[in-house]
């Protein structure tokens, strides 16, 4: 009796499935099929035969591409999303428009969650799903008879095409890390970002021309060094230490590097990281072709080279107002940071530049900045006359002027940051002319000269008093 009922039900299911195959479009068929199979699997009698049912009724295979996998960015996700976004925009009903910097036209992309694609005579379906936390998964569905073509050829094709489209329309991004207290699961984004559109270039950078050329040559060698780094057995990365007084152009230099190489920037805030494990997680979630920046590293960590023995080489900092709260301490060891710079973990990624900046080079631990770890030390000091001429060209469109000689003489005697020079040269209003801007700079230089002379005299007087006091003692 039960066998007859089951046979009758099975015949009905066959008829229903055949009808669905004929009437409904593919995406709807797949959705109905999923509901149909899940219903069958709830029937106790059918559980023993569920695999056979699924194989019979579901000839489709599904591959999921999550945005994040095990705390790391899934590097296949973005190229696939780009490829699908650009797919047949002339036929799509919903589009997204954006404009890349220095591009004359708009970049149009699909803004639909479902896309059908064809490749070498086979048909596949893509669907984008977003969970409650906002993290995305791309689902690829195809017939099982196409498995070999899809897995061996199609996916690779899609990723390469997506990368090619990205290279043409790439938007650089400026990332900053989320506090570790906001990391909820392995899918949580460690970084948030905005589009990076800084105008700085090496052409507009105010610095000694010879030093500028040296940096450009070094960056070019790095950018073209894939085979060389592989040959010598080193990770394809480069470290730069930028040091000098405030206002000398360290942040501008980083922006110029990014624009030159078309790299995104990861601005790493170390005080938001609790320990070495979190440091590894967040750094392995960065992309290739990027610049990882730790600005004012002497302020971020205790790297003065005078760590107390009882702290066992431990760098400690506390959030403001939490000095007495043990739970709010953040711990990162020097070895943990160094391990990512040039240890085993440094190989996790390619084409990466690591930049440290500091206003106080002498405060840093020698182990952090030794040659080979930070490959190039770049001093960005006070404004020279050559740097001034670059700024004068940028701000006033001047190659020469009668006041240049006086400015050159004052700059030999006075320390002034390039940022201060730029502030004086910038036109305050429409009536300000070149003469007015240059005279403003001369006045600023003369004021600084007086202050610096007074400071020198004060220092000499103080030193003389100390010497005299010692003479009286002995």
Curated annotation (Swiss-Prot):
SUPFAM superfamilies with a match to the protein in the record: P-loop containing nucleoside triphosphate hydrolases (SSF52540)
Necessary cofactors: Mg(2+)
Signal sequence range: 1-25
BP GO terms, sorted: response to salt stress
Binding site for ATP: 244-251
EC number, UniProt record: 3.6.1.-
Domain of life of the native organism: Eukaryota
Keywords from the UniProt entry: ATP-binding, Hydrolase, Magnesium, Nucleotide-binding, Signal
Gene induction: Induced in roots by salt stress.
Similarity section: Belongs to the AAA ATPase family. BCS1 subfamily.
Protein name from the UniProt record: AAA-ATPase At3g28610
